[in-house]
Amino acid sequence: MVRAIVGANWGDEGKGKITDMLAKASDIIIRFQGGSNAGHTIINDYGKFALHLLPSGVFYQHTTSIIGNGVALNIPYLIQEIESLVERGVPKPRILVSDRAQVLMPYHVLFDTYEEARLAGKSFGSTKSGIAPFYSDKYAKIGFQVSELFDEDLLREKAYRVCELKNVLLEHLYHKPLLDPEEIIKELLRCRDMIAPYVCDTSAYLHEAIKEGRNILLEGQLGSLKDPDHGIYPMVTSSSTLAAYGAIGAGIPPYEIKDITTVVKAYSSAVGAGAFVSEIFGDEADELRNRGGDGGEYGATTGRPRRVGWFDAVAARYGCRIQGTTEVAFTVLDVLGYLDEIPVCVGYEIDGQVTREFPTTSKLEKARPVLTRLPGWKCDIRGIKRYQDLPENCRKYIEFVEKEIEAPISMVSNGPGRDDIIMRR
């Protein structure tokens, strides 16, 4: 059975913890899109980890972790991430890398950095991990597929062709040093030697695994509002963040995805620029930010303070809908225990009209939040294991959110640890 775990909002919802928890009963965990531009934070018996390329199931010895064809594969980064786990006492995970994945090159990071600097105040808030240049090259058909690393003649011809194109931009747009094709070839061969032990036809491997009835998790990165088609364009990432893309990015039939667990945060947070209707500021924001997450709301990749706001039911309902949600994991609920009352955004006012539908970006930028307030529970809920043992106002908050987002909440996370979870269904 194949289950996808995805985010409903901007990312940072707590997908890593939910994947880590569900991986216990899984055989295979797959990253199917994105790259090292966003981190999944996990706290377990080995310590606290921020994974960027590895799937969040790597801490279980019985699992196989797959880097799918849809991933932006930074090979040195992946190897470093594997080695850092082993250095901290984690048994070396079993990793497979799709021979159809494409390689994120050092020049992708350079171009990302140069473009953000060129755009200055109009930049997209990139993590400067090379993601947009990587996917641009992939769809312009000038990327390097992992399988191509093992054909030196092809690499050489392609490296010279790519450098010819890139150097025009470097010389005339960015005014930066030119690429040396021989250095690019050396880097590609170095990457080949590092990745060779892990490479296989992962689509064929998954085909057999599905026939055998093995349990498979697709782990998404970021969330619905960062999708390039359905998100807050252009303040989006460069690969699809939807569960539907899991079939493409992993190389399996779409009808095999039976369950879609969408992770929804009990309040809102985002890294980077773009419209954020329920955002709060000042001391109010600082307190929520410092109490939030698993040690404060700061980006796992950049360390930047996350923007924070109240729960946005309009955005979350939309995010769940476009994911095709079958169940919701509701996270970081414990953070809100300090509040006397909890505002929730239930609508947007745009040009004097109130809507419950999530609009396109030009309208979203004019939206003002329509808030309702629920009573807080004013206590620490960590350690509670049964839903009925939660404070009444806490249960009312969960049930209000469930009604607003129109999707069943099956799991409630009430702490940062793997076992801090309440199963409702």
PLM regions: where:
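Non-transmembrane, aqueous-exposed alpha-helical and coiled segments at domain scale
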Residues: 1-425
